[in-house]
């Protein structure tokens, strides 16, 4: 009985506590709702009650009455949602109080000086204004910071005067921000110091920029004066047409005006069961590094302005000479427009009706003689225009930097990870290309023509746009000096391959990766890399997984000629397979060579790589090997190139973007500082070259027995013994060398046989 009484008493106590708790929470909800209502009605000043609430708030805090009413709404909302009173003296709330007190003090100090007068009694004067405002709000208006502000300011103003009061207000605000943000006062002042230094440096830079702008403005004025003189000279020249045709002066455009324009801003299939191995991809290196930051374009050096004012004098002289030359040969034509480019000036010549284009083209040597130019290039006709272009080299070449091409590109699209910067065309337009639309690129040119700088510009463009999980690279550099600077960047699948014998193996591994990707596509029912990545996104959303997407792979071969000398068959087969099939798998080739002969750039390779860049070459034969047409033999070198993109019938002349070694190192160091390289073991070439499959020649084993027995090896010996041709005998010797049966060729000495004759046979 006693136990039952205790249990009953315990239950009564528990129920009493729960009732009290519910009652307290209910009271808090009611109080919170009332505070919210007061705040909203007061802020909106709804009716007599709303105006009364607002006037009361104004009586206490004056100009900060809206802040007080908003605080009422926040406090009420907290009480309704959390059903408890907040800790009103927590660290952050104390900081808020100090900020409000600081503003109240500063506002009321301002109110005293400008409204009451410096000698007026603070509290009594404020009280009179507050009472008047309470009953006649529309007649008084501004009451400073209310009675709370008056009480604080009266003390500080009496003790510290105006300046001291303002200092106290600022210190209260700073210390309040420190408590709210958790930043110490020392850190706060250090941040302010850094900001002041930043503003000072910006002001200094703006001052220097102003000097540059002034210099450019003076240059433009000089150019306009020269243009006026050029127009006058052209107008005075004799007309070509005998029928008194009215001559219009040519329009002269300058590429530098486009450089100074405003910069452009820059960086699905139903779900099916898929095996885990089909969703694996590059393991760690393909997962997104969320803290990786792309390099800024500011890491590159700004372009140096080149003075080309003298070129305008030459333009008017050349225009007169061209007209005189055409007239002397009986060709009726007129110059309609002149484009001053970075390295070349193009004169657009419009022939009259009945004048054959071939007649003007045949005058190329005479035009070069008249202009005293070392060489000219004639574009007949200009695509999309009824005019012929005569390109003449400038006296002063204006350098085009990679930074200005990236900054002044209106077609810049940060989502295109393989968009590369090439340079500027003759009209001054920034030339960009999308590697995924090319889809492969052949770069050829003589030594010193700018080929390596172009390759560095392409790689740097990709590093500035793409993160390591978005684009991977395989670099092959038999020269061992051009691409080694990129060792260690996280975008590499494997270290830069410098051994020509391993290059074929590296290309075969890329081919194997391509086949693996197509196997993934077949398992997931997708057709290309974009479709597969969309599939993986859906798979991750449905299964809450984080399977990596496939990155682009860019294979860069810096010197194809060296590879073709060492292992031409294997290299050509791998390049051909990649060129034919790799586009849909997201794999793209960039192949460079300085010897554009047919034994290096074979017909099979050229047929499968439609986009080409030709730098200066020594002969028209080399130009035809690259572009299937002449023109590259007339280029100037130092970055002067012809771009023939896929689908285009005529090449575009471009002055390539320059990139210094220091800029390349700066970009590489920044990228490495963001993320270290994590090479894929499966993509690193082995130390020992792979021997593919079994021997297909049925005479191989008999030939090995003969060589071991005779302890000598030669092609002629195999020809005599087996009565076979030279080619077959040479292939057998090469197969034995690859498998280690015989040693390498040593000139006039016989090959060394590495396999000894067994003792019992001796």
Curated annotation (Swiss-Prot):
Chief localisation class: membrane
Subcellular location: Cell membrane
Location of the FtsK domain: 428-624
InterPro entries in UniProt: AAA+_ATPase, FtsK/SpoIIIE/SftA, FtsK_alpha, FtsK_dom, Ftsk_gamma, P-loop_NTPase, WH-like_DNA-bd_sf, WH_DNA-bd_sf
Keyword hit for Iron: no
Regions of this protein lying in the Cytoplasmic compartment: 184-762
Amino acids binding ATP: 448-453
Domain notes: Consists of an N-terminal domain, which is sufficient for the localization to the septal ring and is required for cell division, followed by a linker domain, and a C-terminal domain, which forms the translocation motor involved in chromosome segregation. The C-terminal domain can be further subdivided into alpha, beta and gamma subdomains. The alpha and beta subdomains form the DNA pump, and the gamma subdomain is a regulatory subdomain.
GO molecular-function terms, A-Z: ATP binding; ATP hydrolysis activity; DNA binding
Name this polypeptide is given: DNA translocase FtsK
Biological source species: Listeria innocua serovar 6a (strain ATCC BAA-680 / CLIP 11262)
SUPFAM superfamilies registered for this protein in UniProt: P-loop containing nucleoside triphosphate hydrolases, Winged helix' DNA-binding domain
GO CC annotations on file: plasma membrane
